[in-house]
Amino acid sequence: VPVDFLLDTGAERTVLTPAAAQRIGAQPPRIEFDRRMHGIAGSLPIREVELRRFTIGGVAIPWRRIAVAPATLPSVFFGPLDGLLGADVLSFFDVDIDLPRHRMILHEQPSCPLAAPDWAEPFVAIDTGRSAGEHLFFPVHLDGRAIVAIIDTGAKITTLSTKIAMALGVSDAMLARDRSITLRGAAGESVTARVHRFSQLEVGRDATHDPEIAVATLNLRDADLVLGFDFVSSRRMWLSYGSRRIFLSRAKRQRSD
């Protein structure tokens, strides 16, 4: 039975909606545990199902225990999404994500660390750590200060924790003058954020000048900054979970104002 997932590198678990789980006839495992799904600022309880078969583009997925939760998903033109494809599945592979061309390729993890992908476009290589939640985390520099970031294709906008923003010299008065937006997490939570313009964000050797970044109180366990879809949408990236490296192409367009 085909299902449509949102590619979400920031989600720790792959999640089906209750409606999708019922449609495909997914069954609960013999032994169940109390689990929770964590969002940007909250969590909600989940249950689990065992899939008889799970493939993506013809590639068999070895991990077939999937979470079921009423996750908050964005609207797409062809109808409702059936869930999130998260890091618990992605981490079995080296993942080549070409967002400008709307394409993803799953590669078997190499027996030795990948030297570099065979891309025509220029890119940067980033050494990372790998958290308990299967996030590849790595240092970036925001206004000259080293902080820790993850890539989250499920996040609409790049977001920084309020605590780190304050450490960078952003005051409450400055944030009060910034534009207010509402962030919605997959766990159903809503968070008020302020969009603040910083001087420079440096990822690898690739610098973005005058980036606009949302500042919000976040429930992040392994990062200070979430690099969202606004940052990665014009880039190609290779996530090598086995060798703990990320290869990131340079943006097709950079803000100059």
What are these regions (language model features)?
Residues 1-257:
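Pepsin/retropepsin-fold aspartyl endopeptidases
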